Amino acid sequence: MDTSTVLEKYTQDLSNLPLEVRHLLEEIKSKDVQVSEARKRYQTRDHQLHKFIRTNGTLTKHPKEDQLYSKIEEDMKLVQKLQKEKILLANTALFLISKHLYHFETDIAKLERDELLPPLEHPIELTEVSKDEYAKSLNGFSDSASATPTPRNGSSATPVAETVKKIQKKKLSVKGASSSSAQSSSASRQVKRLRSEEIEDPLPYEGGSLAFNGNVAMSINSAADANGPNGEDADNNLYCFCQRVSFGEMIGCDNEDCKYEWFHWSCVGITSPPKDDEIWYCPDCASKMEKRKKKRKN
């Protein structure tokens, strides 16, 4: 590895980052608009009830009180949901940038060790306080990502975001599970039921735990340290419709020809693991199979 190779590598790796971050920020802005509209709706209904009480007293019930309260509660729940989605998007952007920054700093350090690049006279170091603040920002996100996914190899595509996590080499190797169709189907259903606590615990992070979903604590440092200085063995594959790295809990599609193979629970609306004998297809494969059935009937 030399300086020109590193430069070329990161020029390519970072070429799509601005578009990814811009997409995430646009999504956050869109959800902000939805939050504002929902707030206006429930505040208007609340004012309507208060106006009626001021006019008629507290003993007289508004003729549409139950309907209004139901609508207010519905909008408040929507606002909570949208706020959690905004946190997810913001942390996805944070992770994307942090991932590239960490690998870049790792390669720079290697070039300096090999005396291919002179070190900075006054290197900028991340203080322990900064590390703790960064860790807390991700720890605070754990509530909004409580239903997350266990990885498997998938085809790479342009990453576009919806959720986020750290790079970590998994205890389970799913490559061998797809050696034959019979073994693959069985292994797929077994892996789908694996929970986050069944994944190998990573090494601790110096500046604070980057806890995610309460059970899986991951950090960029620990993932790279466990897999070599350059993180060469780290799982950098992209999975799911959102085309992000594996994190948390994931579910595998039982269609052997599935394009994505593995999906984050939050991306496909899964909140609990499937039963032992349950077969699960992703929305894409399920739609294709339904079309095939209709064609056969015709």
Curated annotation (Swiss-Prot):
Residues 140-206 are annotated as: Disordered. GO terms for molecular function: histone acetyltransferase activity; histone H3K4me3 reader activity; methylated histone binding; zinc ion binding. Residues 20-86 form a coiled coil. The record marks 239, 250, 254, 262 as: Histone H3K4me3 binding. Zn(2+) 1 binds at residues 240, 242, 264, 267. Disulfide bonds: none annotated. A zinc finger (PHD-type) spans 237-288. It is found in: Nucleus. InterPro entries: ING_fam, ING_N_histone-binding, Zinc_finger_PHD-type_CS, Znf_FYVE_PHD, Znf_PHD, Znf_PHD-finger, Znf_RING/FYVE/PHD. It comes from the Eukaryota. Pfam families: ING (PF12998). Keywords: Cell cycle, Chromatin regulator, Coiled coil, DNA damage, DNA repair, Meiosis, Metal-binding, Nucleus, Zinc, Zinc-finger. Its main location: nucleus. One of its GO terms (cellular component) is NuA4 histone acetyltransferase complex. Zn(2+) 2 binds at residues 253, 258, 282, 285. Component of the NuA4 histone acetyltransferase complex which is involved in transcriptional activation of selected genes principally by acetylation of nucleosomal histone H4 and H2A. The NuA4 complex is also involved in DNA repair. Involved in cell cycle progression and meiosis. Belongs to the ING family. The PHD-type zinc finger mediates the binding to H3K4me3. Interacts with H3K4me3 and to a lesser extent with H3K4me2. Component of the NuA4 histone acetyltransferase complex. This is Chromatin modification-related protein YNG2. It comes from Candida albicans (strain SC5314 / ATCC MYA-2876) (Yeast).
